[in-house]
C-alpha cells in the first residue's frame, strides 16, 4: 500500500514539474536583460512567456528598451507583432512583441529602427511627438502603408504623449488598439487611429477586441518616449 502511495506522489510531482513554466524575466529599466536565463514563473502567471522591445532611433544614437515576463495570456500559439512609426528623417520608433504559449520566447531581434525615406514619398502624414496635440502638428511626405495618430495617458502622471507618423503597422493591430481607452500596464490609449494620405487623421473602422497583451510593447515604449519629453 505504501509503495502505491509513494508511486502516486512521484507521479504528481513529475506532472507538476513538467507543467512548470520557465520564462526569461527582466526589465531593462531595472536590470540588464543580456544573457538572461529563464527562471520559474510565479503561480499566477504560468500560461505563456511574453517578450516586448522597442527602440527609438534619433540620429546615430538609438535608445533600446525591453521587457520579458511570464503571463496568463493564452496566445494559442507563438505570435510576433512588429511595426515602425517614422516621425522625421532622423527619428523613428520600432516596436516588437512576442507571445509564446507554454515555452520561452526567442530573444527579440534587436532590430534597430532606421529612418524612412523622405521627400518624394507617396504618403503625407502628420509626423511629430509631444505632450499635447497643439504641439504636434507638423506633416511630412514619406514611404509607408498608413498614417497613425496615438494619444496615451499615464497612470499617476499628468503628462500625455502624442505620437504621429508614417507606419507599416498592420490593419489588425490598428483594429485591436483602435477601440480606444484601452489600458496596458499603467498606460491608457485614448486614441490609436490609422488612415491613408491625410493631414487630419481619420480612423479605420475598428472593433472592440479588448486588451491584448501581445501589443503591450507599445505601451511600454510610450513610457520610454515620455521620459524623452521630460
Curated annotation (Swiss-Prot):
Disulfide bonds: none annotated. A lipid is attached at residue 211 (GPI-anchor amidated serine). It is a lipid-anchor; GPI-anchor. InterPro entries: CNF-like_PLA2_Inhibitor, LY6_UPA_recep-like, Snake_toxin-like_sf. The keyword Lipoprotein applies. Highly N-glycosylated. Not O-glycosylated. GPI-anchored. The GPI-anchor is cleaved, leading to secretion into the colonic lumen. GO terms for biological process: defense response to Gram-negative bacterium. Gene3D superfamilies: CD59 (2.10.60.10). Coiled coil: none annotated. Residues 212-230 form a propeptide. One of its GO terms (cellular component) is extracellular space. Keywords: Cell membrane, Glycoprotein, GPI-anchor, Lipoprotein, Membrane, Secreted, Signal. Residues 1-20 form the signal peptide. Secreted protein specifically required to prevent invasion of Gram-negative bacteria in the inner mucus layer of the colon epithelium, a portion of the large intestine which is free of commensal microbiota. Prevents invasion of flagellated microbiota by binding to the flagellum of bacteria, such as P.mirabilis, thereby inhibiting bacterial motility in the intestinal lumen. Segregation of intestinal bacteria and epithelial cells in the colon is required to preserve intestinal homeostasis. This is Ly6/PLAUR domain-containing protein 8. It comes from Bos taurus (Bovine). The gene is LYPD8.
